[in-house]
Amino acid sequence: MAIVKLRAPLRDLAGGSREVSIDGSSVGEVLQELERQHPRIEGWVLDEHGRVRRHVNVFVNGERVREDAAVASDATVHVLPSISGGER
């Protein structure tokens, strides 16, 4: 199983889990399973077509990837939502 590492706010939506173990052969499958296991995350990472949202960066073993990238069973997947703010 791949290890999926979560940052805020996703960590909060996953009940405070910093990392979860998830099966899947592609990034898309892993993220769909993440949403299935943690329904509060649904809509934050994947859009209605199953694609990674533009404001979310996904890295597999340190390489930025999209939803069709392969995921080995020993991979580490980082899911990083972009952080933005308003004017000062």
Regions found by a protein language model. Name each.
Residues M1-R88:
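Ubiquitin-like/PB1-type beta-grasp interaction modules and other compact soluble beta-rich domains
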